[in-house]
């Protein structure tokens, strides 16, 4: 079987289109090409004999990708004429899970980032791809796996459980929904311990990901839980939208307050996290306009004080509302009567409560501890400078960070 260069352009290019574009057996520089996939193609070309692939050759290429590509990645690549290869970074930051389906003709396999994709197709979860592991499913349906990293450890990104993942998914053996319920329990404990003077009449979630935490928080406080905002399904995630004015306008278009749930009440709004603060500030104002007497705000996550460089398009530190402010100052910026953040250790405990086997997490956006050990202040400054330049020129700032996040080392 002859090796072909792997191509990735945030979509799929088949062999016919690749031939038409003159892309076969060479790497074509393109914006936002995934460095890890390009390195994989390059390494397979180097290790193959006369451009012919076999299972050992493919597995032999992965350790060099792990060595040369720093950071977080979970890759699923289709190798034309051979099969599907999946591998995960040695730190296990980004998730990858294997599913299977038993049929009359044999066992079928699939790999996805979340178990919900496996469930929705009628497959069953087999297991997670281990950090540093590669999994290969050939065209005949044979399943192979190999640990390709000499050193590996599981450090799942805790922001997956806070916000990114769907609540009906399992990530590294932990139910996202149960983890968010536990986050609400921890928040309730903190409020009863440190904010017992707050006279909360009702708990209202900011749709959608904060609902489980808000529900459990209300139960823990013994106050009613109400849906106070109706969400439009046509507006995307506001914290990754470019431009402050666009984000502010999008919040109003995305959410509409139900006045009867706010009028004359002391409301406790609950969100999964506070990033820039644009959404939270607008929502606090909307609650007041709907008639709330007092507006308290609770975050199921700790203050986001540092940028994420492991695959989340998070703002630079200068754009993070909590980066250089105390919690009291953030509350003032939001216009809230009180602000309650989750403690980082409580957040970790909430996820461990669901799966005690998870002992370490990637938490850099909260504590500035970048577990790969190679993220320097100069690197963070380079990201910020490039994003600022992209924003000033009107280019896509998201791409500016993506190019820098996927760093290849010689």
List each language-model region with its residue ranges:
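PRPP-dependent phosphoribosyltransferase catalytic core
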Residues: 64-66, 81-83, 88, 100, ...
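Short, glycine/charge-rich flexible loops or terminal/linker lids adjacent to PRPP-binding catalytic cores
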Residues: 219-267, 278, 305-315
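Conserved short alpha-helical segments that host acidic/polar catalytic motifs at enzyme active sites
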Residues: 39, 46, 50-131, 136-201, ...
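Extended, hydrophobic alpha-helical segments in both membrane/secreted and soluble proteins
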Residues: 203-206, 210-217, 221, 225, ...
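Acidic, divalent-metal-coordinating active-site segment for phosphoryl/phosphodiester hydrolysis
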Residues: 10-17, 275-276, 280
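C-terminal long alpha-helix characteristic of the crotonase
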Residues: 15, 24-49
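CoA-thioester-processing core
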Residues: 1-7, 20-21, 36-41
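Phosphate/diphosphate-binding loops
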Residues: 60-64, 116-117, 121-125, 129-133, ...
């Amino acid at each position: 079987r002859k090796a072909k260069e792997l191509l990735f352009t945030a979509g799929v290019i088949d062999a016919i289109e690749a031939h038409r574009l003159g892309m076969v057996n060479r790497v074509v520089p393109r914006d936002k090409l995934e460095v890890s996939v390009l390195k994989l193609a390059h390494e397979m070309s180097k290790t193959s004999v006369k451009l012919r692939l076999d299972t050992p050759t493919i597995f032999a290429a992965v350790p060099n990708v792990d060595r040369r590509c720093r950071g977080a990645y979970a890759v699923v690549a289709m190798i034309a004429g051979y099969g599907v290869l999946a591998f995960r970074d040695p730190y296990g930051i980004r998730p990858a899970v294997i599913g299977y389906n038993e049929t009359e003709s044999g066992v079928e396999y699939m790999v996805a980032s979340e178990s919900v994709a496996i469930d929705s197709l009628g497959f069953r979860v087999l297991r997670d791809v281990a950090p540093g592991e590669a999994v290969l499913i050939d065209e005949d349906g044979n399943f192979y796996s190999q640990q390709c990293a000499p050193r590996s450890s599981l450090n799942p990104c805790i922001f997956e459980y806070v916000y990114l993942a769907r609540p009906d998914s399992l990530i590294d053996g932990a139910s996202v929904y149960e983890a968010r319920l536990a986050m609400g329990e921890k928040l309730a404990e903190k409020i009863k311990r440190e904010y017992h003077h707050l006279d909360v009449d009702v708990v209202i979630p900011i749709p959608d990901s904060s609902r489980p935490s808000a529900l459990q928080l209300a139960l823990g406080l013994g106050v009613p839980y109400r849906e106070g905002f109706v969400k439009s399904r046509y507006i995307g995630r506001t914290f990754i939208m470019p431009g402050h004015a666009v984000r502010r306008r999008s919040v109003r278009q995305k959410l509409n307050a139900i006045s009867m749930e706010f009028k004359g009440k002391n409301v406790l709004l609950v969100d999964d996290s506070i990033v820039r603060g644009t959404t939270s500030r607008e929502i606090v104002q909307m609650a007041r306009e709907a008639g709330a007497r007092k507006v308290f705000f609770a975050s199921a996550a700790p203050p986001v004080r540092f940028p994420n460089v492991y695959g989340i398009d998070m703002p630079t530190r200068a754009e993070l509302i909590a980066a250089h402010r105390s919690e009291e100052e953030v509350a003032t910026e939001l216009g809230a009567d009180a602000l309650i953040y989750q403690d980082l250790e409580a957040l970790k405990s909430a996820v461990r409560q669901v799966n005690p086997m998870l002992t370490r997490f990637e938490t850099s956006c909260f504590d500035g501890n970048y577990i790969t050990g190679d993220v320097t202040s100069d690197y963070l400054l380079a990201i910020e400078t490039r994003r600022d330049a992209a924003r000033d020129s009107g280019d896509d700032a998201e791409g500016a960070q993506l190019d820098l996040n996927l760093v290849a080392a010689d």
